[in-house]
Amino acid sequence: MATQRRANPSSLHLITVFSLLVAVVSAEVFFEESFNDGWESRWVKSEWKKDENMAGEWNHTSGKWNGDANDKGIQTSEDYRFYAISAEFPEFSNKGKNLVFQFSVKHEQKLDCGGGYMKLLSGDVDQKKFGGDTPYSIMFGPDICGYSTKKVHAILTYNDTNHLIKKEVPCETDQLTHVYTFILRPDATYSILIDNVEKQSGSLYSDWDLLPPKTIKDPSAKKPEDWDEKEFIDDPEDKKPEGYDDIPEEITDPDAKKPEDWDDEEDGEWTAPTIPNPEYKGPWKPKKIKNPNYKGKWKAPLIDNPDFKDDPDLYVFPKLKYVGVELWQVKSGTLFDNIVICDDPEYAKAIAEETWGKQKDAEKAAFEEAEKKREEEESKAAPADSDAEEDDDADDDSDDADDKSESKDDEAHDEL
């Protein structure tokens, strides 16, 4: 599929930056989408959930606040809906090369529960039926739901099983545009970037459970009988002081006085009350010292895992052919834009700087202005709301009076 970018000379999407020109020379771009005119001919809206009247519609827009009104993406537009849309590109394999998957996403709705991730799919897919059960190769991007889920998903499919990344990668939660980038390399290492800043990195071997572990604890190993795991022992030189056991736990209160009105004949013989003995230290225990024979906690030695079989193509996705969005949103308003699938991280970085990088300050200013207007409108509406509440309270008082009147009438009727 040909790269799709605007031909408008004034657009920020023009490749005018030197770094981008340099990147173009070396980069192989498999797919690129900025949702310019004609985008609907390149994307297929799924009919998934349509029969249940739960399929959400997409808007082609730059959003309520933006850094360039001409830079449009696709935005979810209906609450409590499922969304599924995909685009096809010429099938390719990332064997022997980097795989870079990048896109921008903005949650204008102050998202409290919903996804902002995208998927790469392999093989042949019926795009009209693309949905939650459609197998995918990579799922990547932010996911937010309540206070517990605010993270970046990086799910890789290996041997028909979806594997979640084991590391936590927090996502952005504000209402501005952010760029998410996933880089997968031939040496089985990866990086996750947000706004061109690396947030996580590592290896496919350690950060996903794609393969069995290389080593395991030796199941036949036994702890030696003379293995000493006690870090501290009683001091053999410490001796109990003479008379220690004779110290009473309580003593007579030396400050206690017999009450003047105490009558021994009537009250019995007066006995001074007891109090805790400050000299009493409890049962004697010898001091603890470092155990000279301490060997630490015993652990079974590691051995090669007989079930481990290395896969030099662990990073390879051989038949990548589609990119799509499939998600559920309680509150709509998420906007996707500037999708790039290529083999050069520098090219993706340059695209991010040419779009998000040049627009972010203007977008933030537009957002702050929109928030200011919203707060002013809410402030103006507050007195009217207060008057309405007073009217409601008056109505409630009237209703209560009517209810009491009706209650009295009922009581009077019962008496008759």
Curated annotation (Swiss-Prot):
It holds the Pfam family Calreticulin. Its main location: endoplasmic reticulum. Disulfide bonds join C113-C145. Residues 1-27 form the signal peptide. GO terms for biological process: ERAD pathway; protein folding. One of its GO terms (molecular function) is unfolded protein binding. An alpha-D-glucoside binds at Y117, K119, Y136, D143, E326. Residues 268-306 are annotated as: 3 X approximate repeats. Residues 215-286, 355-416 are annotated as: Disordered. Residues 215-225, 355-380, 404-416 have a biased composition (Basic and acidic residues). Glycans are attached at N59, N159. Keywords: Calcium, Chaperone, Disulfide bond, Endoplasmic reticulum, Glycoprotein, Lectin, Metal-binding, Repeat, Signal, Zinc. Sequence repeats lie at residues 199-210, 218-229, 235-246, 253-264, 268-278, 282-292, 296-306. PROSITE patterns: CALRETICULIN_1 (PS00803), CALRETICULIN_2 (PS00804), CALRETICULIN_REPEAT (PS00805), ER_TARGET (PS00014). InterPro entries: Calret/calnex (IPR001580), Calret/calnex_CS (IPR018124), Calreticulin (IPR009169), Calreticulin/calnexin_P_dom_sf (IPR009033), ConA-like_dom_sf (IPR013320). GO terms for cellular component: endoplasmic reticulum lumen; endoplasmic reticulum membrane. A motif (Prevents secretion from ER) lies at residues 413-416. Residues 226-236, 244-253, 386-403 have a biased composition (Acidic residues). It is found in: Endoplasmic reticulum lumen. Can be divided into a N-terminal globular domain, a proline-rich P-domain forming an elongated arm-like structure and a C-terminal acidic domain. The P-domain binds one molecule of calcium with high affinity, whereas the acidic C-domain binds multiple calcium ions with low affinity. The interaction with glycans occurs through a binding site in the globular lectin domain. Belongs to the calreticulin family. Molecular calcium-binding chaperone promoting folding, oligomeric assembly and quality control in the ER via the calreticulin/calnexin cycle. This lectin may interact transiently with almost all of the monoglucosylated glycoproteins that are synthesized in the ER. This is Calreticulin. The lineage of its organism: Eukaryota, Viridiplantae, Streptophyta, Embryophyta, Tracheophyta. The gene is CAL1.
